[in-house]
């Protein structure tokens, strides 16, 4: 399975036929620019391109009224003056003789993508469509939107495939009030939207775009609005919104499908949005969503934005503005779906595993390399002496293989790796690997988090420990509320993940931790696993490090008071240094 790309050139046919400053930005070039960018970067050829058919009137009727569908169909025969008159009946809308055809293709593209993902033909995908859809309502066009593509796709997934939980993430800079209205009383759809709001003074100027609108009836609590009351929101704001608001809700909701209303006017450079998030940020957001719903993500284009340029450097940073190049935010969002985090060159070896004892049988996924290489014996012994630890012969053999894997990651030859060590040598091996990293990079910036003991403790802003949460809610709060904010704030070159004797993590917990740490470091993770655990952990870790979705943590259970207390203690101590932990508004 791969990534689908859904597009049809006929969707460029509709265009504005009269002067209208408000509507002139909705032009064919908004769509062709996105496709051209994908082609220039070589992403189109890595996707499975799917054909598109028009959505049927029955499929449109999953969301829209028969009268409204008939009205849009009638525009095929109207002249310019009649089209102009009809358009003025709606807010920020224009009609064209090809509007009905284009809008049916746009809805059909979303349906085609959902079918491909839910039948297993592809793992995820992107539909480049026009006109957009998230503002359109049951019987009204609105904000350039004619048919609500994402809402139709969600209803289709429920009706045809029997899905009971669908997450819709709307990161367009405008509130997708059309989607909200359609699902506001439906508990099977969790709708999340961030949008420029400015206390109701930004389009669409609706009080129901505010945070206190949470759905109604049985759907109360399933609408989540995050209104931006100022412009200039950047990468840290978007990441904080995902880590502290969206993802905790999404994990508890446990969706079977994720639909993204992918509007990119929320990126830097768009004059309408006036936000500061770089294109790379959307790649990270997409990768964070991939741990949900078995990785079944369907992104459907809304407002493409102005396609700001971004860095083509091999190591893009989330805290720097984009520089001159030909990359678009749409391309950055697609890259992680193709298992290419951000813009880092793909190493020759994706995943490597080194065993303490050669020839041990492991059931590993295809494409995972059994690494037999080792650092030279003299070099290994020198590192062991430097650490002043007693290594037995078996320990030295395992250390040599671990050093070889580490050098491969640091030199860009290996993306991720799993190494085994003996129980007694785990701590010493980790110490040697840390020293090797410091020697290679010439820096001593180390963030050390220990999961052990019965109480949270802190020795410095870079060294602390926490007890292992025993509930799913506590473990998720630990990852989303502490580990990932620290990882994104620290921006490490790589992650060393040591799973020593009695580490206490269940396989699913270790897999989720590894999967979610891939994004901040571009996949550069070395997992050090105690040899008695390797048979159970190796395949699971290899799968998630390769980009597969981690296994479920099981039924959701609320965090205990003790787990909440430990987390709050650490956050209170660390907040002054780590900005992504600073999510509470200052007192007035």
UniProtKB/Swiss-Prot annotation:
Coiled-coil parts of chain: none
Superkingdom of the organism of origin: Eukaryota
GO molecular function, one term: acetylspermidine deacetylase activity
Region of interest (Histone deacetylase), residue spans: 1-302
Localization, UniProt: Cytoplasm; Nucleus
Keywords associated with the record: Autophagy, Cytoplasm, DNA damage, DNA recombination, DNA repair, Hydrolase, Metal-binding, Nucleus, Phosphoprotein, Zinc
Keyword Magnesium: no
Main localization, broad class: cytoplasm
Gene Ontology CC annotations of this record: cytoplasm; histone deacetylase complex; nucleoplasm; nucleus
Annotated EC: 3.5.1.48, 3.5.1.62
Reaction catalysed by this enzyme: N(8)-acetylspermidine + H2O = spermidine + acetate; N-acetylputrescine + H2O = putrescine + acetate; N-acetylcadaverine + H2O = cadaverine + acetate; N(6)-acetyl-L-lysyl-[protein] + H2O = L-lysyl-[protein] + acetate
Active-site residues (renumbered): 135
GO biological process: one example: epigenetic regulation of gene expression
Family to which the UniProt record says this protein belongs: Belongs to the histone deacetylase family. HD type 2 subfamily.
Subunit structure: Interacts with HDAC3. Interacts with HDAC2 and NCOR2/SMRT. Interacts with HSPA8/HSC70. Interacts with MSH2.
Function noted in UniProt: Polyamine deacetylase (PDAC), which acts preferentially on N(8)-acetylspermidine, and also on acetylcadaverine and acetylputrescine. Exhibits attenuated catalytic activity toward N(1),N(8)-diacetylspermidine and very low activity, if any, toward N(1)-acetylspermidine. Histone deacetylase activity has been observed in vitro. Has also been shown to be involved in MSH2 deacetylation. The physiological relevance of protein/histone deacetylase activity is unclear and could be very weak.
Protein name: Polyamine deacetylase HDAC10
Protein source organism: Rattus norvegicus
């Amino acid at each position: 399975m791969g990534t689908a790309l859904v597009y049809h050139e006929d969707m460029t046919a509709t265009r504005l036929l009269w002067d209208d400053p408000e509507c002139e930005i909705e032009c064919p070039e908004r769509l062709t620019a996105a496709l051209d960018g994908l082609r220039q970067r070589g992403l189109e050829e890595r996707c499975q391109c799917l054909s598109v058919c028009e959505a049927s009137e029955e499929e449109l009727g999953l969301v829209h009224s028969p009268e409204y569908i008939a009205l849009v169909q009638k525009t095929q025969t109207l002249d310019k003056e009649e089209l102009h008159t009809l358009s003025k009946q709606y807010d920020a809308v224009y009609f064209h003789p090809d509007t009905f055809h284009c809008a049916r293709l746009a809805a059909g593209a979303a349906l085609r993508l959902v079918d491909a993902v839910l039948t297993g033909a592809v793992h995820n995908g992107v539909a480049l469509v026009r006109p957009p859809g998230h503002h359109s309502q049951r019987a009204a066009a609105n904000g350039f939107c004619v048919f609500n593509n994402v809402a139709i796709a969600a209803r289709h997934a429920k009706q045809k495939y029997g899905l009971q939980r669908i997450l819709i993430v709307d990161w367009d800079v405008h509130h997708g009030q059309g989607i909200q209205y359609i699902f506001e009383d439906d508990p099977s759809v969790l709708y999340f939207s961030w949008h420029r709001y400015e206390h109701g003074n930004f389009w669409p100027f609706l009080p129901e775009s505010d945070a206190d609108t949470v759905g109604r009836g049985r759907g109360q609590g399933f609408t989540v609005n995050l209104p931006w009351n100022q412009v200039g929101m950047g990468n840290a704001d978007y990441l904080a919104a995902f880590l502290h608001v969206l993802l905790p809700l999404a994990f508890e909701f446990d969706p079977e499908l994720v639909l993204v209303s992918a509007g990119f006017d929320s990126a830097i450079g768009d004059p309408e949005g006036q936000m500061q998030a770089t294109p790379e940020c959307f790649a990270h957001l997409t990768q964070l969503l991939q741990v949900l719903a078995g990785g079944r993500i369907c992104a459907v284009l809304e407002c493409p934005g102005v396609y700001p340029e971004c860095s083509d450097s091999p190591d893009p940073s989330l805290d720097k503005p984009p520089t001159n190049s030909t990359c678009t935010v749409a391309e950055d969002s697609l890259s992680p779906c193709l298992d290419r985090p951000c813009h880092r060159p793909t190493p020759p070896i994706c995943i490597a595993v080194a065993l303490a004892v050669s020839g041990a049988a492991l059931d590993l996924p295809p494409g995972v390399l059994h690494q037999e290489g080792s650092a030279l014996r003299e070099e290994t012994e020198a590192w062991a002496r430097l650490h002043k630890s007693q290594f037995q012969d078996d320990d030295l053999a395992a250390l040599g293989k671990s050093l070889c894997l580490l050098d491969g990651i640091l030199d860009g030859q290996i993306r991720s790796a799993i190494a085994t060590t003996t129980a007694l040598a785990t701590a010493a091996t980790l110490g040697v690997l840390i020293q090797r990293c410091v020697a290679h990079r010439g820096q001593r910036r180390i963030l050390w988090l220990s999961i052990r003991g019965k109480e949270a403790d802190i020795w410095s802003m870079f060294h602390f420990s926490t007890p292992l949460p025993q509930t799913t809610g506590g473990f998720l709060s630990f990852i989303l509320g502490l580990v990932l904010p620290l990882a994104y704030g620290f921006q490490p070159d790589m992650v060393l993940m040591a799973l020593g004797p009695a580490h206490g993590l269940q396989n699913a917990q270790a897999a989720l931790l590894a999967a979610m740490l891939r994004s901040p470091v571009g996949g550069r993770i070395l997992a050090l696993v105690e040899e008695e655990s390797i048979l159970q952990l190796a395949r699971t870790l290899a799968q998630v490090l390769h980009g597969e979705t981690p296994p479920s943590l099981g039924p959701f259970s609320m965090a205990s008071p003790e787990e909440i207390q430990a987390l709050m203690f650490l956050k209170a101590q660390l907040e002054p240094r780590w900005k992504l932990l600073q999510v509470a508004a200052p007192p007035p």
